């Protein structure tokens, strides 16, 4: 009888090994898919990319979440905004960050009603869902916190928290808790 108990125990151990192997295999497959997706994002995301008017539609409609900065090269506030957007682009790979010289994209500046620079237009699945004009939402000052910009983009629903790098500017929980207020 003790030999049967020993054999039954060994059979259960082998069953556990099979289950662990299946779980391990599934996890490895999941990690490979995540790595492949991250590499895909890195090839098209992760930077503030300047585009021209003829690439605008392709870039905006080809990704779920897009932030487009309409700028003028001589405006200091546009340069300030660029620096913050470059940092956010490196941390939120699931959101594409683009910039367009407004002088060279008159068709889209007209269609989107852009009259003040800088202007950020937020796109979700190719549709303009929101915009941020100038620095008014940041207290009208040049030294706004990058967290304020991240919260603003998040409120538009286009800041992807699922596909991020190790660098952390802000978390989804910070946005929910409104952790970074304008008067901080």
Swiss-Prot record:
Highest taxon of source: Eukaryota
GO cellular component: cytoplasm
Ranges where the record places region Thioredoxin fold: 45-184
Family from the record: Belongs to the phosducin family.
Name of the molecule in the record: Phosducin-like protein 3
Biological source species: Dictyostelium discoideum
Gene: phlp3
